[in-house]
């Protein structure tokens, strides 16, 4: 399929039959599924499900990330038609990828929300697929990890973030995006000894055994060494990547609820992710994209690129196992 075929393609999210292959249609028209994948709730034959969780009722400061999944999907339409740069293969040709749509939930019943998230991801995993989740605020990580831990055991987590999200909070009924890693460790769904946080640049009294490569260290060491250390920490176990967009400096991702200066440049994040090729990635997310503060759309574009890199990593793992 060539670029000129765009004149004949529209609404592939509803009309395309094949879960594999490039989708060539005008970026400014049609239904904006992620990468113009097919929207479906049928996970038969799906290798990887992209899904949105438009929730921001756990934020501490500025809301708006409930609009993140929609913005990331729209920004994904700007991805090049060519294979993703720097990977040497095209995951869209090798993986059956579907857009599983957004998770349904009653916004007025927040007490039910964590369980709904776990059930949602559990359904994807039970079908034999992996998940890439578009947030939404970062609280969703804890209930996502519950589903993954049921299948794989306590999860090594690679967390890109400006904040540790380890505020002590033993009230498991509270919903707060600054506490979800604390709760993930305390409930045994995250493995702190094999987890690492990259890009941190806010204080934390107790990292609960999680290793940290803070933002100054990233700038000093360079992406290749950061990736080497991350790989050494997580080893060969099935692992999960959670990418809070505020890991990036506000110059590259201003549209987020809790921006912190001194963060990663987009090129650093891209290089680290690509240098992680070969880790045993079984799922991931990109969270905290907040379109109301994203006046140029740059943050949504960054979020779409991160999601694409997660897809590339997921596919690379399966190529190595084939």
Give each language-model segment a name.
Residues 2-322:
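Conserved alpha-helical scaffold segments that buttress catalytic/binding sites
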């Amino acid at each position: 399929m060539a670029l000129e075929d765009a004149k004949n393609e529209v609404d592939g999210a509803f009309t395309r039959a094949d879960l594999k292959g490039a989708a060539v249609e005008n970026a400014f028209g049609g239904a904006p599924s992620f990468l113009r994948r097919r929207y479906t709730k049928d996970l038969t034959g799906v290798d990887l499900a992209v899904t949105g969780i438009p929730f921001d009722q756990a934020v501490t400061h500025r809301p708006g990330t409930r609009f993140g999944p929609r913005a990331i999907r729209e920004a994904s339409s700007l991805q090049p038609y060519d294979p993703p740069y720097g990977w040497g293969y095209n995951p869209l040709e090798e993986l059956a990828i579907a857009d599983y749509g957004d998770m349904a939930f009653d916004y007025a019943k927040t007490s039910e929300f964590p369980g709904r998230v776990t059930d949602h991801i559990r359904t994807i995993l039970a079908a034999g697929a992996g998940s890439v989740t578009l947030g939404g605020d970062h609280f969703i990580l804890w209930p996502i990890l519950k589903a993954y831990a049921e299948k794989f055991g306590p999860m090594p987590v690679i967390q890109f973030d400006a904040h540790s999200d380890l505020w002590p909070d033993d009230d498991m009924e509270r919903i707060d995006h600054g506490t979800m890693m604390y709760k993930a460790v305390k409930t045994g769904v995250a493995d702190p000894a094999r987890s690492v946080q990259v890009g941190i640049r806010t204080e934390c009294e107790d990292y609960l055994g999680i290793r940290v490569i803070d933002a100054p260290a990233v700038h000093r060491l360079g992406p290749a060494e950061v990736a080497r250390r991350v790989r050494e920490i997580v080893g060969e176990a099935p692992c999960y990547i959670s990418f809070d967009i505020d890991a990036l400096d506000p110059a590259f991702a201003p549209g987020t609820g809790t921006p912190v200066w001194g963060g990663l440049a987009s090129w650093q994040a891209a290089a680290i992710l690509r240098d992680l090729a070969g880790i045993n990635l079984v799922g991931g997310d990109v969270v905290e994209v907040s379109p109301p503060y994203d006046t140029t759309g740059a943050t949504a574009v960054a979020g779409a690129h991160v999601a694409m890199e997660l897809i590339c990593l997921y596919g690379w793992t399966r190529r190595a196992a084939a």
